[in-house]
Amino acid sequence: MSFKKIAEMMRQAERETKKKTLAFEQQAFEYNYKNGAIKITILGDLTLKSINIDPVLIDASDKVILEEMIIEATNEAVSDVKTKYDNLVEKTMPKVPGLF
């Protein structure tokens, strides 16, 4: 395979990756923590869009526990979206023998 062909493949992959990345960043992902006790919607660019807390969890005496659950749910949602992004990038990049 010629260097020119490889360079063109890389440019095409870069364009395709950029296009898919922009679409991914605007996509909303819903994450349900503990069977929907806390629902988090996060965008692909990791912007937190919404948090919905089951009213059963809202009790002033359990404030610390609720805060810990929100942090854990948010971190799990971010991790999930990062994994989906990594999978998207991996699928987009071309497989050039001997290059990577």
From Swiss-Prot:
Record GO terms (molecular function): DNA binding
SUPFAM superfamilies, per the entry: YbaB-like
Cysteine-cysteine disulfides: none
NCBIfam families: DNA_YbaB_EbfC (TIGR00103)
UniProt name for this protein: Uncharacterized protein MG134
Protein source organism: Mycoplasma genitalium (strain ATCC 33530 / DSM 19775 / NCTC 10195 / G37) (Mycoplasmoides genitalium)
